[in-house]
């Protein structure tokens, strides 16, 4: 008798995606982050649903409804902090997932890579709108500053900003629509994840060597399900420690003050996962230039496949490219640090140098180094 998982219309899809899927035999723990991101998304949707049951999207009561969740709702505090810190874990896994794709040359799977970039933008939009919802000082001023950037668009900028606000400033209408979008976007993300997986399973996964895997594949279950479970345990352990011991470690103290349009916080800054892009935005004195640089800091990922000049797919046997990759990583850490610092000397100059280095590495230095390596290998 044929196994039901191979004949049932629904289970057949699950089986070919997660059980009998032929996977390369040598993929390392760096390939765990896809499943970890799926786990993060599930955690965010579940905790978010419970938070939405008690939250009110109204400027008069939003802040106190979040306080009510933490103080009066059974286990409300843990749900709230799981959601807030879950977002940080989500972005940590996202950055590592993208970094792995760059290091091992997974961007050559162009459809999967491009859907991944769309996913990154969507997750960033969702996180930004979620940060506005508690209606604290940083929520309000973050929303004001970031939405105001759209006014740099010629001709339609001002109208566009007022259209997003639903008035002449960030107010009740803005909060209501941000809550609506924040609720619906995770489900759109889930649909995009399925498309991402669909394209991935069309071509098959890359591996650390960057070589074709057709000759040596193993079933996904039990080998990689066990491996993914180990990664999931580490993720949950880290998240639990963060939530139970220092839930406010990654937050901003200013967000514990109710939003006040008449008082500007001394340093307006977003959550840590946006700081690198915020530093790039701030390092350009021109408003429109800054906005374009901000968008390009993420969109530049889309042209990485075009800039690939190396004859080898993976960086594993290309030491010069590895050095450039780790310089890029260090540069992103520098930008993240600068994004959280006040706008004064020497931080402005460091931010400008780091921003120039970021774009130079991806657009010029790394492709040139790859060409040099080709010459050295006589390819």
From Swiss-Prot:
Q: A single GO molecular function, which one? A: metal ion binding
In which broad location class does this protein mainly occur, judging by the first location in its UniProt entry?
Answer: mitochondrion
- Gene Ontology biological process: mitochondrial electron transport, ubiquinol to cytochrome c
Instruction: Tell me what topology the record assigns in the membrane.
Output: Multi-pass membrane protein
Task: List positions binding heme b b566.
Answer: 97, 196
Q: Which SUPFAM superfamilies does its entry note?
A: a domain/subunit of cytochrome bc1 complex (Ubiquinol-cytochrome c reductase) (SSF81648), Transmembrane di-heme cytochromes (SSF81342)
Please state what the protein is called. Cytochrome b
């Amino acid at each position: 008798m044929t196994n039901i998982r191979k004949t049932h219309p629904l289970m057949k899809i699950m089986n070919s995606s997660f059980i009998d899927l032929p996977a390369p035999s040598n993929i390392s723990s760096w390939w765990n982050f896809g499943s970890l991101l799926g786990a993060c998304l599930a955690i965010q949707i579940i905790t978010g649903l419970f938070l939405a049951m008690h939250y009110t999207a109204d400027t008069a009561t939003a802040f106190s409804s979040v306080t009510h969740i933490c103080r009066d709702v059974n286990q409300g505090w843990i749900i709230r902090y799981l959601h807030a810190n879950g977002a940080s874990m989500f972005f940590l896994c996202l950055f590592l997932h993208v970094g792995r794709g760059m290091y091992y040359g997974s961007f050559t799977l162009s459809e999967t890579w491009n859907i991944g970039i769309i996913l990154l933008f969507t997750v960033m939009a969702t996180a930004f709108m979620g940060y506005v919802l508690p209606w604290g000082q940083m929520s309000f001023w973050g929303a004001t500053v970031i939405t105001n950037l759209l006014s740099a668009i010629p001709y339609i900028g001002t109208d566009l900003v007022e259209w997003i606000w639903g008035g002449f400033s960030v107010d009740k209408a803005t909060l209501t629509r941000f809550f609506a979008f924040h609720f619906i976007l995770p489900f759109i993300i889930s649909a995009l994840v399925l498309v991402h997986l669909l394209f991935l399973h069309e071509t098959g996964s890359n591996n650390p060597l960057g070589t074709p895997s057709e000759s040596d594949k193993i079933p996904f279950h039990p080998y990689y399900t066990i491996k993914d479970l180990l990664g999931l345990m580490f993720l949950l352990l880290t998240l639990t420690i963060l939530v139970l011991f220092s839930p406010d470690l990654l937050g901003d103290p200013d967000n514990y003050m109710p939003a006040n349009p008449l008082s500007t916080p001394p340093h307006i800054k977003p959550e840590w996962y946006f700081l690198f892009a915020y530093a790039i935005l701030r390092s350009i004195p021109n408003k429109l230039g800054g906005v374009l640089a901000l968008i390009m800091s993420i969109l530049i990922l889309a042209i990485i496949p075009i800039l690939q000049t190396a004859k080898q797919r993976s960086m594993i046997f290309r030491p010069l490219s590895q050095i450039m990759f780790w310089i890029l990583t260090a540069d992103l850490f520098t930008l993240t640090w600068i994004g959280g610092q006040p706008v004064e000397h020497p931080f402005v100059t460091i931010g400008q140098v780091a921003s120039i280095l970021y774009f130079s590495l991806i657009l010029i230095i790394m492709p040139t180094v790859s060409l040099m390596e080709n010459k050295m290998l006589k390819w």
